Amino acid sequence: MMRKWLYSTNHKDIGTLYFMFGIWAGMVGTSLSLLIRAELGNPGSLIGDDQIYNTIVTAHAFIMIFFMVMPIMIGGFGNWLVPLMLGAPDMAFPRMNNMSFWLLPPSIMLLISSSIVENGAGTGWTVYPPLSSNIAHSGSSVDLAIFSLHLAGISSILGAVNFITTIINMRPNNMSLDQMPLFVWSVGITALLLLLSLPVLAGAITMLLTDRNLNTSFFDPAGGGDPILYQHLFWFFGHPEVYILILPGFGMISHIISQESGKKETFGCLGMIYAMMAIGLLGFVVWAHHMFTVGMDIDTRAYFTSATMIIAVPTGIKIFSWLATLHGTQINYSPSMLWSLGFVFLFTVGGLTGVILANSSIDVTLHDTYYVVAHFHYVLSMGAVFAIMGGFVHWYPLFTGLALNPYLLKIQFFTMFIGVNLTFFPQHFLGLAGMPRRYSDYPDTYTSWNIISSLGSYISLIATMLMLMIIWESLINKRIILFPLNMNSSIEWYQNLPPAEHSYNELPILSNF
């Protein structure tokens, strides 16, 4: 039993490990976010000073991004579904796949230890120098966080190489690239983004490490360095990263919507592929829109404003194609469909606030206020997380062969929907009123919206616990699925439920596409 899980080279077992790790990390990250909202629930300080507060904020961001969303979306859904959807017997490099997973537990341990030794890394997830220099953050906290990022980065790069190789080499004989399922495409593009952006982050944080410990001056003006260089390097990774977090979600939503609509494929399949490629490409040329306040040239700001707005075009193509897929169907409000509809609506809202922030002139005012927090939590907490939830309840019968309770799932969806909206909608108002980010306290003027926001976070907590209870109930009661209720336009539903340990002993052949 021990050997099965420690030395596994089976994509399904490794996918399950990723799910368990991601759910655990998600609970840690959620606890941290509740500490943040408890601190901000009333004026005055509750937990302590801004150092401990910012340490909590930093850990919350890193855990949610690197140990919850990425492991579940790419590691969990990617590992499980990509080989099944391609008709491949496993991933291209099964042992490397195992290593990708086992680099994550040491990585999260380093991250957690960074917040419990010395004063913690209170730098925000961006780890900007000079705040992250050895003067402002003496001690080993930031160094531990850097090593944690290195491990998580190596894990993701190895995973990316694995997915790219699998997708290029392990398709059925006569399946062309444009015939691949959209989820496989989305994971492939995500892997490419990871492969191109993570080495830049590794370079940036390695330079920061030597600045802190070996007396170099990459980011120290006293020695001829420039802290702005760090920001450029970080955001050259950081912006593709946010698309890495959402693209697999796009793929899952495409599958769920077409299946639940009873359509054989998504509307504008090829357009969806090109839209994802465009989003991936454009994601690399807009990074400095995170830096409108550092004093760039007017023409530079004009370029980054325009380029950022162009991303709205392929994103809009995706939104309208999903709506077109839904068109003319009698919508069946199943739990996975509810998550998808919630995703499309809330992701659009988050996207619109993004277009507002893309204007460099307006962003000077809104930068580092709660407006930005509201924007990215709409696309992450209601985009990425809704996609994860929708994908989970949609494919859970395939992964386990068991049924979840749909009635409880609907209650859970509406609880979560109310919770996240109540948490993050008021933050738009706080941002417009000028409440800055990353402070543990605020003037009394902002009290009312903060109380409402914190109330929403407690509702989300109840929803999260309800989800865990639903999964537990399903595993205890073991309502075994006799046959899938799905359209078999996606090949993964032709498996046994759950699939056999080795699903494709002979390779499938494509016919009548």
From Swiss-Prot:
Stretch forming the signal peptide: none
Record bears the keyword Transferase: no
EC number: 7.1.1.9
CC cofactor: heme; Cu cation
Family: Belongs to the heme-copper respiratory oxidase family.
Ligand binding (heme a3): 375
Species of origin: Choristoneura pinus
Gene transcribed to yield this protein: COI
Presence of the UniProt keyword Transport in the record: yes
Entry GO CC: mitochondrial inner membrane; respiratory chain complex IV
UniProt subcellular location: Mitochondrion inner membrane
Sequence positions that bind Mg(2+): 367-368
PROSITE patterns (alphabetical): COX1 (PS50855), COX1_CUB (PS00077)
Source species taxonomy: Eukaryota, Metazoa, Ecdysozoa, Arthropoda, Hexapoda
Pathway participation: Energy metabolism; oxidative phosphorylation
Function: Component of the cytochrome c oxidase, the last enzyme in the mitochondrial electron transport chain which drives oxidative phosphorylation. The respiratory chain contains 3 multisubunit complexes succinate dehydrogenase (complex II, CII), ubiquinol-cytochrome c oxidoreductase (cytochrome b-c1 complex, complex III, CIII) and cytochrome c oxidase (complex IV, CIV), that cooperate to transfer electrons derived from NADH and succinate to molecular oxygen, creating an electrochemical gradient over the inner membrane that drives transmembrane transport and the ATP synthase.
UniProt-recorded name of the protein: Cytochrome c oxidase subunit 1
GO biological process, one term: electron transport coupled proton transport
Major enzyme class: translocase
Note describing how the cofactor binds: Binds 2 heme A groups non-covalently per subunit. Binds a copper B center.
Positions of Fe(II)-heme a binding: 60, 377
Binding annotation for Ca(2+): 39, 44
Listed Gene3D superfamilies: Cytochrome c oxidase-like, subunit I domain (1.20.210.10)
Molecular function (Gene Ontology), one example: metal ion binding
Keywords: Calcium, Copper, Electron transport, Heme, Iron, Magnesium, Membrane, Metal-binding, Mitochondrion, Mitochondrion inner membrane, Respiratory chain, Translocase, Transmembrane, Transmembrane helix, Transport
Protein topology in the membrane: Multi-pass membrane protein
Transmembrane regions listed in the UniProt entry: 16-36, 62-82, 101-121, 144-164, 182-202, 233-253, 267-287, 304-324, 337-357, 384-404, 413-433, 451-471
Pfam families cross-referenced by the UniProt entry: COX1
Alphabetized SUPFAM superfamilies for the sequence: Cytochrome c oxidase subunit I-like
